[in-house]
């Protein structure tokens, strides 16, 4: 965020109260994406967006006066040009382009409204760190990895154009790379021509709940463009999985919850570390928030928690919706309360076709199940064997009124975890009857339905066999070539 004395003065005149440097510095956090938003910071962001939109509009008008198009590159910093903000359309841009790190960044671009077309720059960039003598096979492998993750998202909502960046003279020395890039371009054109004319079928409406909501759509738990961080990859996998699943995805904040928006969704996901914007911090102390979500689930909605959902220590609980989730975290405060629910029941609709052990990434410790919760997976220490107050729950389900919840300690991206998340969405959303509709049993393959045709993809570099179910549940075995 930017700041200046003039901006502070104009903010005061418009909003009627003062903003100070400390409101931006925020004790040294500088209001990074992971910091829980304050109302004052929201106002200042809106103020900045309006100013930038007015300024950029002058520039785009100049560009258009010369008969040219105005395109913005979505980089690591875009102060005031929030692509999912209320004022983005006022910039009057023609196009948006950004780097593609996988499915999440595809959707971060392709879901934007207010421009005529969106473009993705694929990896690897044509730079000497990749395009040096003897490294062609690695360059092709990186291209394939990037395309396979991006393609999952393209099957749901494709970009309008794809390209590369860097020095063409370097890429020209790698004929295998050029040939593979040409194949990918042909495949992209076919996907685009199909998906842009026929909306893919979605089987559930999912809302991701955090402090930011829509303005940080597809940017949750992310630093820059899908850079890997040990502290965030266990959450990042949720959004990578969602980017290519047959579900409609929205991003909502706590004001949306209080304003009755939950009725528009089948399942709500809350994921993140305690105290962060992604989990929600002290928003979970708002009685209206927890009441609205309890009511939503009790009446048949689904709730999925990952990591430390609804987390803030208060009133003897760490997970404020532990009654809905069926689990809580022992923080050393309730050790005197015996915990007997440690029996594992791994067979469940959610885990059908899923291989154990499940990859939980960085995981979470000291999660315990409340009485009545169904424990799907739990880990025990070999230091002490007993029947009470032992074990750490990894995965669990719970029933709350007519609704259901699912908890998991972490969900890094993999084909198996994407399938697990999809099945969790169907189960919590009371949609098990849609299980074998446009569906592949082999998690390395996926199916998409477009009204009059299906697409079945192989997301690996090896041949795959899968049982495929059409929209009516009819099964057939398919042999799929690599990619």
Question: Predicted regions: what is each one?
Answer:
Residues 1-93, 99-102, 106-109, 196:
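Polysaccharide-binding and catalytic clefts of secreted carbohydrate-active enzymes
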Residues 34, 111-141, 170-174, 214-217:
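Active-site clefts of carbohydrate-active enzymes
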Residues 70-73, 94-98, 118-124, 160-164:
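Hydrophobic faces of well-ordered beta-strands that scaffold small-molecule active sites
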Residues 280-357:
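A glycine-rich, often tryptophan-bearing local segment used as a flexible ligand/cofactor-contacting loop or short
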Residues 146-149, 158, 166-205, 241-244, ...:
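Extracellular ligand-binding/catalytic regions of CAZymes and related secreted enzymes
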Residues 36-53, 91-100, 130-141, 165-168, ...:
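The substrate-binding groove and active-site-proximal loops of carbohydrate-active enzymes
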Residues 151, 157, 179-265, 450-451:
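Aromatic-Pro/Gly-enriched surface loop or interdomain linker
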């Amino acid at each position: 965020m930017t700041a200046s004395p003039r901006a502070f003065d104009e903010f005061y005149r418009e909003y009627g109260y003062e903003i100070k440097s400390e409101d931006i510095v925020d004790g040294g956090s500088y209001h990074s994406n992971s910091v829980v938003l304050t109302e004052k910071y929201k106002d200042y962001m809106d103020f900045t967006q309006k100013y930038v939109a007015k300024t950029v509009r002058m520039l785009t008008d100049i560009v258009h006066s010369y008969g040219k198009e105005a395109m913005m590159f979505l980089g690591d910093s875009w102060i005031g040009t929030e692509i999912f903000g209320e004022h983005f359309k006022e910039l009057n841009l023609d196009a948006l382009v950004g780097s593609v790190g996988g499915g999440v960044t595809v959707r971060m671009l392709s879901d934007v409204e207010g421009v005529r077309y969106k473009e993705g720059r694929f990896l690897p960039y044509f730079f000497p760190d990749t395009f040096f003598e003897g490294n062609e096979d690695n360059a092709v492998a990186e291209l394939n990895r990037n395309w396979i993750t991006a393609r999952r998202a393209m099957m749901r909502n494709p970009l309008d154009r794809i390209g590369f960046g860097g020095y063409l003279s370097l890429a020209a020395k790698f004929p295998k790379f050029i040939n593979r890039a040409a194949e990918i371009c042909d495949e992209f054109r076919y996907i685009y021509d199909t998906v842009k004319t026929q909306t893919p079928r979605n089987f559930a409406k999912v809302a991701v709940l955090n402090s930011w909501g829509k303005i940080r759509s597809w940017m949750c738990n992310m630093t820059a463009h899908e850079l890997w961080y040990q502290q965030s990859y266990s959450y990042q996998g949720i959004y990578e999985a969602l980017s290519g699943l047959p579900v409609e995805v929205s991003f909502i904040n706590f004001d949306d919850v209080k304003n009755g928006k939950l009725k528009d969704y089948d399942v709500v996901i809350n994921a993140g570390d305690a105290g962060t914007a992604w989990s929600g911090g002290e928003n979970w102390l708002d009685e209206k928030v927890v009441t609205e979500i309890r009511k939503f689930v009790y009446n048949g909605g689904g709730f999925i928690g990952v990591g430390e959902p609804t987390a803030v220590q208060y009133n003897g609980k760490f997970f404020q919706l532990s009654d809905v989730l069926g689990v809580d975290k022992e923080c050393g405060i309730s050790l005197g309360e015996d915990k007997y629910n440690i029996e594992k029941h791994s067979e469940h609709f959610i885990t059908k076709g899923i291989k154990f052990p499940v990859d939980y990434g960085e995981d979470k410790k000291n999660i315990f199940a409340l009485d009545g919760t169904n424990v799907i997976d739990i880990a025990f220490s070999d230091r002490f064997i007993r029947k009470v107050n032992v074990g750490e729950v990894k995965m669990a389900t719970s029933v709350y009124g007519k609704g259901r919840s699912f908890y998991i300690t972490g969900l890094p991206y993999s084909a198996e975890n994407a399938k697990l998340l999809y099945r969790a969405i169907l189960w919590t959303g009371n949609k098990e009857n849609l299980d074998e509709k446009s569906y592949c049993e082999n998690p390395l393959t996926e199916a998409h339905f477009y009204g009059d045709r299906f697409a079945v993809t192989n997301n690996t570099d090896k041949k795959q066999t899968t049982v495929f179910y059409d929209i009516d549940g009819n099964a057939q075995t398919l042999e799929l070539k690599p990619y």
